[in-house]
């Protein structure tokens, strides 16, 4: 499995069989480079400009933007309803957590605004790789993200949705999240290929491509 961190909450995930899955594409108002991609599947956690922009995408793709269980090109995908805030969606609406089931199970939390409830964790099932927002303001903050990561208990944690030099609005820094962990690998690349899981939990901090 290959995972490329484009920027913000957007990743391009390529499964062992070659299926390309794009998560939460953003528009150019965010500050990052917008890429012209040709994915097979696009997952959007909600409709905001920084998570649901599909205008630059090419070719035919399957869009998944709701809760439920889906199978696309042999890849199983679960969408689990959560909220973008701590007020059951009254402030910012719903958010979909996606779990991609392939050789490894990858969970993308979108703009999760609250700590996960027991029934949501049960629906997610076993997660190997967790893509988690950590910057607060519009999502869970660093401490809440630590609590969520502890509850999900994956082998690999990849932070997303935090302040960078290019981002045009304020979020918390990723260091506020990583300081809670002992095993942190800072990578000088936006792309990783995962063939095996580490024996112990590890935070992997990727560079963003955009």
Q: What are the functions of these language-model segments?
A:
Residues 1-30, 91-110, 129:
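Conserved beta-strand hairpin/beta-sheet module of binuclear metal-dependent hydrolase folds
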Residues 4-6, 91, 156-210:
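Binuclear metal-ion centers of metallo-dependent hydrolases, dominated by the metallo-beta-lactamase
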Residues 13, 42, 77, 111, ...:
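Divalent metal-coordination and catalytic microenvironments
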Residues 25-27, 46-47, 82-84, 110-114, ...:
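Active-site metal-binding loops of divalent metal-dependent hydrolases
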Residues 27-69, 122-131:
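Active-site metal-binding motif and surrounding structural segment of the metallo-beta-lactamase
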Residues 28-31, 47-52, 114-117, 137-141, ...:
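Active-site environment of divalent metal-dependent phosphoester hydrolases
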Residues 54-107:
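Portal/gating segments that form or line small-molecule/metal binding sites
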Residues 86-152:
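Active-site-proximal loop/helix segments of hydrolase catalytic cores
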